[in-house]
Amino acid sequence: MKAVILAGGLGTRLSEETSSRPKPMVEVGGKPILWHIMKMYSSHGINDFIICCGYKGYVIKEYFANYFLHQSDVTFCMKENRMEVHEERAEPWTVTLVDTGDDSMTGGRLARVADHIKDEEAFCFTYGDGVGDMDITATIEFHKQHGKQATLTATYPPGRFGALDIDNGRVNNFKEKPKGDGAMINGGFFVLSPKVLERISGDDCVWEQEPLIGLAEDSELMAFEHQGFWQPMDTLRDKVHLEKLWSKGQAPWKMWT
């Protein structure tokens, strides 16, 4: 199965960190948060990634092009124009980086990678700025069992995200960003059928609006309830919080060894 990760946004609320790099390349524990998200998926056996690039996408391309320089010790033989990598730390990943435009919205970015996912039975989809101890394997199995077009992970963070009305796993209503009312919210980890691509109207389409609302209205959106840790990195305060968890060895999203 493939995982599509949105990595093209400006990250305006993290402007201190994103003036020279896209938000998913902001580091936690010396590694881009994008790396942490990919490690989460990889710990569940998902190693084929489609990265939706946009703002300063070349930074992401350069990171993967020089991955071993970031991860390993190296020796440069200047005379022979040769580089030797020591203790090469490879990941079992296939990474496809797609330029989805500087100004495309979330739905538009997903539509722009359609050629890479249209023949899949299902695929994972998430944002490049949130981590958690989600049971991705169980979410995929839940999606296969109910047979609907879309599954999202529902969780309980602060009330500034899209609230869900859930009945026996089925999402009856999707409301974007209400003021906190204690409802479960969209945690941003999806399993989707390629049929959802038909609901995206173009580059200006916001995934969290017409497509998700329409899926809920058509009884095609299901929720896998997550009771554990989830944290988006929207602000500098969020970044500091994640850094503290990582530095103390208390990062719940670190499900790999």
Where do the protein language model's features map onto the residues?
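Conserved beta-loop-beta/alpha segment of the NTase-like Rossmann-fold superfamily
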Residues: E62-N168
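A generic fold-level signal
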Residues: S20, A90-P92, M105, M184, ...
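Short conserved AdoMet
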Residues: S19, I46, A65, K118-D119, ...
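Structural beta-sheet core signal
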Residues: I5, I51, F125, A150-T153, ...
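N-terminal glycine-rich phosphate-binding loop and ensuing alpha1 helix
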Residues: M1-Y67, L97
